[in-house]
């Protein structure tokens, strides 16, 4: 049985909530020092920042106030840094470490792999994207190649429009 609470606890994805709130308000400067160091070693370029901002805005059904977007991006970077740190810790024994996460966290151009390449350039990464047919990422070409080394395209999942109830 899938236990997302276990995953959230292992990677500390949910918090502590006060840290996430502080980062949303104050940016990476409010992050714990070890995670701030990872974020600072792997700064986002303007293209990646704009892409994350767009995804955050669209992912919140266009309802996210513009002034909150930079803080939400900082929280996304905090989660990515936390996952990168967990992977580096897990790989210290010399064996492989795996991250199974949403595509926003596994993109090579703006998420955990980008951070790992900066803070641990000698590590070998294999970045697999699993995306739904019909999404921008599912289109083979230069954009997909920047994001993943292996791309698996699946049929779209049946779901209600989450924005319809807003």
Model-derived features: where do they sit?
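A structural signal for short, well-ordered beta-strand segments and their strand-loop junctions
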Residues: 5-10, 99-100, 127
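Solvent-exposed loop/turn segments at secondary-structure junctions
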Residues: 6, 12-16, 103-107, 132-135
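N-terminal start-of-chain detector that recognizes signal peptides
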Residues: 70-71, 98-101
């Amino acid at each position: 049985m899938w236990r997302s609470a276990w995953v959230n606890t292992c990677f500390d994805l949910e918090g502590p909530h006060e840290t996430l709130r502080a980062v949303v308000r104050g940016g990476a400067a409010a992050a714990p020092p070890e995670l701030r160091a990872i974020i600072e070693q792997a700064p986002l370029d303007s293209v990646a920042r704009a892409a994350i901002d767009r995804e955050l805005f669209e992912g919140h059904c266009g309802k996210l106030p513009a002034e909150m977007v930079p803080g939400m991006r900082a929280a996304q970077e905090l989660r990515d840094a936390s996952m990168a740190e967990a992977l580096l810790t897990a790989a210290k024994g010399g064996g492989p470490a795996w991250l199974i996460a949403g595509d926003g966290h596994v993109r090579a151009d703006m998420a955990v792999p980008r951070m790992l390449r900066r803070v641990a350039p000698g590590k070998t990464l294999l970045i697999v994207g699993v995306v739904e047919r019909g999404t921008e990422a599912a289109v083979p070409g230069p954009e997909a190649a920047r994001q993943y080394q292996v791309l698996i395209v699946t049929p779209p999942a049946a779901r209600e429009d989450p924005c319809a109830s807003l």
